[in-house]
C-alpha cells in the first residue's frame, strides 16, 4: 500500500473510532485494541479466546445456547471470580430457577449475592437500571431474556396476541442501560435462549429471543453448546462444551474455547491447564505420563488434573505463565535475541 493510501486509511480509521468509539473497527489479527478492565470467566480457555483475559466491565454481554448447555453455570463461575476480586454482584432471576446450593458449590458467596425475582419484564429492567445508576454494583446477570415477560402479556388472557411487545421493551431498555453501565463501569450479562425461525430453507434457522436490539448493543456475544459427555466408567459426570465468541468488540472475534463442565463442580480448570500446557509446551507429555518442570505429575490426564487440584501453587504458576504467554500484547512481550545471520562466504 502506498503512503497516500496509508494516510487515507489512518484518517478514516481515526474518524470511525472517534465517531463510533474504540473497538468499532480493528484488524482481525489484532490481539486486543485497548486496555479494558475485565473479569475472568472462570475458564482459562475462554479467557484466552476472548483475547482480553475475560469479559469487559461497563459493557453488555449476551450468552446464548440450547437448554442445559451451561449458560447459567458460566455466569455463576464469573460471579464467583468477580466476588473473589471484591466486586459486588447481582442476579436478576426472571426464570425463578436459581439454585443457591449449586451456586455455593461453584464458589459463589451467596450471603453477599444480591438476588431479585421480578414479576414482570419491565420491573426486572427497572431494577437493572437502578442498580447500574447506583454505581455500587459491578456485575449483573439477567436470567433470562426469554423470561422477561411484558406486564401487558401477564395481565392479558392466554390467547391474546402481543406482537413485538418484548422486543420494544428490550430496545428501550438497551438505550437507557448502555450509558448508565458505561458510567458506573458495571457489566450486564443477559442469558438468552434459542428459537427456530419458521420457513428458513437456506442458512441458519436459529435465532435468539427478544428482537435484534440486544445483538446490536452487546459488546460480546457467546454461543455455548454441549458437544459430548464426560464419563467416569459408564457414569456421565459432566459435559464436553464448546464456546464460540460470535461477536467481540474488545478483541478479534470468532475464536472458540473447548472446556468441560463437571456436574456439581463447574469448569474443569485443572484439565484446561493440562491441555493448554501440553499445547504450548509448558507441560511435557511422554506416552500417558505428564511432567511439569522435569517432575512427573501423573499418568493419564485425570491423575495429572488431580495433582494440579491438590497442588494449588503449581496450578497458579502454570496459569500465570499461560496468561502471560497468550494474553500479553505483542508490543509488551520482551524481545528475543535474533538468530545470527549466516555470512554468504561462510563454509558449512
UniProtKB/Swiss-Prot annotation:
Cellular location(s): Cytoplasm
Name of the protein described by the UniProt record: Protein RecA
Keywords tagged on the record: ATP-binding, Cytoplasm, DNA damage, DNA recombination, DNA repair, DNA-binding, Nucleotide-binding, SOS response
Record GO cellular component, one term: cytosol
Organism (species): Aliivibrio fischeri (strain ATCC 700601 / ES114) (Vibrio fischeri)
GO molecular function, one term: ATP-dependent DNA damage sensor activity
Compositionally biased spans, kind Acidic residues: 338-348
GO biological process, one term: DNA repair
Binding site for ATP: 65-72
Function: Can catalyze the hydrolysis of ATP in the presence of single-stranded DNA, the ATP-dependent uptake of single-stranded DNA by duplex DNA, and the ATP-dependent hybridization of homologous single-stranded DNAs. It interacts with LexA causing its activation and leading to its autocatalytic cleavage.
Residue segments, region Disordered: 326-348
Organism lineage: Bacteria, Pseudomonadati, Pseudomonadota, Gammaproteobacteria, Vibrionales
Family: Belongs to the RecA family.
Predominant localisation class: cytoplasm
Gene this chain is encoded by: recA
Biased composition (Basic and acidic residues): 326-336
Keyword Cytoplasm among record annotations: yes
Amino acid at each position: 500500500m502506498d503512503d497516500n493510501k496509508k494516510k487515507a486509511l489512518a484518517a478514516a480509521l481515526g474518524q470511525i473510532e472517534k465517531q463510533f468509539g474504540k473497538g468499532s473497527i480493528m484488524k482481525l489479527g489484532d490481539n486486543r485494541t485497548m486496555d479494558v478492565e475485565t473479569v475472568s470467566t472462570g475458564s482459562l480457555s475462554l479467557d484466552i479466546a476472548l483475547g482480553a483475559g475475560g469479559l469487559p466491565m461497563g459493557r453488555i454481554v449476551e450468552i446464548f445456547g440450547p437448554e442445559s448447555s451451561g449458560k447459567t453455570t458460566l455466569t455463576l463461575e464469573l460471579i464467583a471470580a468477580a466476588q473473589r476480586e471484591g466486586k459486588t454482584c447481582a442476579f436478576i432471576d426472571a426464570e425463578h430457577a436459581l439454585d443457591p446450593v449449586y451456586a455455593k458449590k461453584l464458589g459463589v458467596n451467596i450471603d453477599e449475592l444480591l438476588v431479585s425475582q421480578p414479576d414482570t419484564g419491565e420491573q426486572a429492567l427497572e431494577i437493572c437500571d437502578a442498580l447500574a445508576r447506583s454505581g455500587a454494583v459491578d456485575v449483573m446477570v439477567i436470567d433470562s431474556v426469554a423470561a422477561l415477560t411484558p406486564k401487558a402479556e401477564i395481565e392479558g388472557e392466554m390467547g391474546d396476541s402481543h406482537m413485538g411487545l418484548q422486543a420494544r421493551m428490550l430496545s428501550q431498555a438497551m438505550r437507557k442501560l448502555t450509558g448508565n453501565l458505561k458510567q458506573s463501569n458495571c457489566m450486564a450479562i443477559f442469558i438468552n435462549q434459542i428459537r427456530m425461525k419458521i420457513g428458513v430453507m437456506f442458512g441458519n434457522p436459529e435465532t435468539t429471543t427478544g428482537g435484534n436490539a440486544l445483538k446490536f448493543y452487546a459488546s460480546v456475544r457467546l454461543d455455548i453448546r454441549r458437544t459430548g459427555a464426560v464419563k467416569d466408567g459408564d457414569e456421565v459426570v459432566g459435559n464436553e462444551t464448546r464456546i464460540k465468541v460470535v461477536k467481540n468488540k474488545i478483541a478479534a472475534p470468532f475464536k472458540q474455547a473447548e472446556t468441560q463442565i463437571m456436574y456439581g463442580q463447574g469448569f474443569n480448570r485443572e484439565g484446561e491447564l493440562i491441555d493448554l500446557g501440553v499445547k504450548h509446551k509448558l507441560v511435557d507429555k511422554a506416552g500417558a505420563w505428564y511432567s511439569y518442570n522435569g517432575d512427573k505429575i501423573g499418568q493419564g490426564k485425570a491423575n495429572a488434573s488431580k495433582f494440579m487440584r491438590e497442588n494449588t501453587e503449581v496450578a497458579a504458576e502454570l496459569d500465570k505463565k499461560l496468561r502471560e504467554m497468550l494474553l500479553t500484547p505483542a508490543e509488551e512481550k520482551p524481545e528475543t535475541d535474533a538468530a545470527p545471520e549466516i555470512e554468504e562466504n561462510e563454509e558449512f
